Amino acid sequence: MAALHHQAAAAPVTTTTDGGELRAMDLYEKLEKVGEGTYGKVYKAREKATGRIVALKKTRLPEDDEGVPPTALREVSLLRMLSQDSHVVRLLDLKQGQNKEGQTILYLVFEYMDTDLKKFIRAHRQNLQKIPVPTVKILMYQLCKGVAFCHGRGVLHRDLKPHNLLMDRKTMALKIADLGLSRSFTVPLKKYTHEILTLWYRAPEVLLGAAHYSTPVDIWSVGCIFAELATNQPLFAGDSEVQQLLHIFKLLGTPNEQVWPGVSKLPNWHEYPQWNPSKVSDLVHGLDADALDLLEKMLQYEPSKRISAKKAMEHPYFNDVNKELY
């Protein structure tokens, strides 16, 4: 992992490296499987000593030459730094050992959240209910705040999507999770692999093969999530990289050098059908003028023109949010 410029005090996390799986299961009782993340299974569990309900993420990864699963350890390192923020899921503990096959097993112990944004949106869609406008606003404010915190610490998430945004149904608290693909970024920008992100929330520069990208990739994802909160439907639902680009171009207009200088030099650029841009207000119903303005600023083609998460928090759309609560 690249060096982080903004080192913060690490959250207190105890690490156990002896006893392996047996030891972890002595401490926690699995209650139910609640999902599978990109890199492992997630269980709702009870800490035997305290009765506290936690989320237990079991990760078994191929090891590198040094015997360390790099993706999981990257996630741990980032979470230790980012856990201090109320909008990033808190890493409580870490257990490491080996299973019977000699593979490294990591149990990451997180605070438990009872749902995620994907389930929350799906429940409203199935009930034919729109998410209330004030709820959309407080969820979006928390998302922008969490992303701004990560970016301020030099971390790109790179896989923001409703499934990775955990929620508390009662309080409407929202927390960013699944930092397994995150990267610290430095200046000048590094070349990054573009085999990342769920297609629907993937920024156009990544789809077009850009090797250099930065925080605006997360902002594009935030904009897609914003539109989905307003409509209960994904804004760009492609099933391949080409289809995803065509969905975007059809709605926002096919980009050119005037709109996005350098776009035709990107590796995956071809001659695409020419579509004229639609108004965002025609695409996303249920948002007021301030909300539409913010959404437009998030979905700019040229990455450098996208609003930052920090600036988004200061947008007039959030003027009536009680920021002390979040």
UniProtKB/Swiss-Prot annotation:
The active site is at D159 (proton acceptor). Residues 28-318 form the Protein kinase domain. GO terms for biological process: cell division; G1/S transition of mitotic cell cycle; regulation of G2/M transition of mitotic cell cycle; regulation of gene expression; signal transduction. It catalyses: L-seryl-[protein] + ATP = O-phospho-L-seryl-[protein] + ADP + H(+); L-threonyl-[protein] + ATP = O-phospho-L-threonyl-[protein] + ADP + H(+); [DNA-directed RNA polymerase] + ATP = phospho-[DNA-directed RNA polymerase] + ADP + H(+). One of its GO terms (molecular function) is ATP binding. Keywords: ATP-binding, Cell cycle, Cell division, Cytoplasm, Cytoskeleton, Kinase, Mitosis, Nucleotide-binding, Nucleus, Phosphoprotein, Serine/threonine-protein kinase, Transferase. SMART domains: S_TKc. The modification Phosphotyrosine is found at Y39. ATP binds at V34, G35, E36, G37, T38, Y39, G40, K41, V42, K57. One of its GO terms (cellular component) is cytoplasm. It comes from the Eukaryota. Induction: By cytokinin, gibberellin (GA3) and submergence. Down-regulated by the replication blocking agent hydroxyurea. PROSITE patterns: PROTEIN_KINASE_ATP (PS00107), PROTEIN_KINASE_DOM (PS50011), PROTEIN_KINASE_ST (PS00108). Its EC number is 2.7.11.22, 2.7.11.23. Its main location: nucleus. It is found in: Nucleus; Cytoplasm, Cytoskeleton, Spindle; Cytoplasm, Cytoskeleton, Phragmoplast. Belongs to the protein kinase superfamily. CMGC Ser/Thr protein kinase family. CDC2/CDKX subfamily. Interacts with CYCB2-1 and CYCB2-2. Binding to CYCB2-1 or CYCB2-2 activates CDK kinase. This is Cyclin-dependent kinase B2-1. It comes from Oryza sativa subsp. japonica (Rice). The gene is CDKB2-1.
